[in-house]
Amino acid sequence: MKNRMISWLVATLFAVPFSAFADKGAFDMDRWYNMLDSVRTRAASENISDTMIKSTLRSPVFIPSIVKSDKNQSEFKLTLNDYLARTVNQNRIAQGKKMRQKYPTMLTRVEKKYGIPPHVVLAFWGMESNYGDVKARHKLTDAFLTLMYDGRRETFFGNQLIALMKIADKNSLDINKIYGSWAGAMGHFQFIPTTLAQYGVDGNNDGRVDIINNVGDAMHSAGNYLNKLGWDKGQRIVRRVVLPADFDLGLLDGKTKKSLPEWSAMGITNPDGSQLPQTDMIAGLVADVAHIERVRDEAKTIAAPDADIAPMPVISAYLTYPNFYRIKRWNNSNWYAIAIATLADELH
């Protein structure tokens, strides 16, 4: 133990950025080295090769900016319209169409094997990495070790590191060349290691699963993941609708489920005013409630003095079908799921 700590001290003392020591006592070296030792012990117990363990722990770096990013994730929430303007812009739509032309055979194979249509695969690819254009900034081993040391989600990030080591070991990858986001997502579809370990697929049959450098592996892995989530290729994701001006906003939680005839009976229509399909399809309902409340308040303040009741603005919302909730198991965000649906429609 002592010799191991000495060797790590030599390797990492100058690797840890000086800012980590800016506040006396802010960085606990003993805790850092004990954590590295626990990683080594666990990795060995889970049959990860000694070569991989040594490679992973050779020159670990604590990165304060990652902790800062994790602690200071923005609480600012874009309106749905602003979010869609950013994520489903004309450039992303155009690039998606180019990618469909570039990879027609691969997309067809993914659809045939996993039942995921090309426009859906492309929508996830576009949202996650702008079709592989997002640059990975952080070496994932350092990111996971840093977040483990931070302590708030040590078990989660420890599991991610071990999964990454197993993936690199199995696929003969240089773990020190695997880069991703500060939170540990990687590749064309931004999988975390535990997701990759469970759903990763060797799409080109070269004996390795590489979702960072191989588009085929990435697409097959995404298709496999969505398939396992239960994707229904014959079902739409959302339906944009208009609600009555005085509609109860408490029903816009995505959790209240009703049949389309039941929603229709409450005054919900298609955007052109036509009736919803009278099928027994069950759907939830979501909208930008905060935005609607602001608009309603503004409408009240500018109402005519002689008006007994302020006119209420038209409410746009989305009926949400089962595929919507499958998307939320990929990324638990209503806005993200609506953006996927919108981009997929543009690429259909």
For the regions a protein language model found, what residue spans apply to each?
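Bacterial N-terminal signal peptides that target proteins for export
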Residues: 1-9
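Cleavable N-terminal signal peptides
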Residues: 9-10, 20
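C-terminal soluble interaction/assembly domains
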Residues: 244-348
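N-terminal signal peptide c-region/cleavage motif recognized by signal peptidases
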Residues: 15-19
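Flexible, glycine-rich surface segments
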Residues: 175-290
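Acidic/His-rich structured neighborhood in mature extracellular/periplasmic domains
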Residues: 82-221, 227
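Solvent-exposed loop/turn segments at secondary-structure junctions
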Residues: 60-62, 128-132, 185, 232, ...
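An acidic, Gly/Ser/Thr/Pro-rich helix-cap/linker signature
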Residues: 23-111
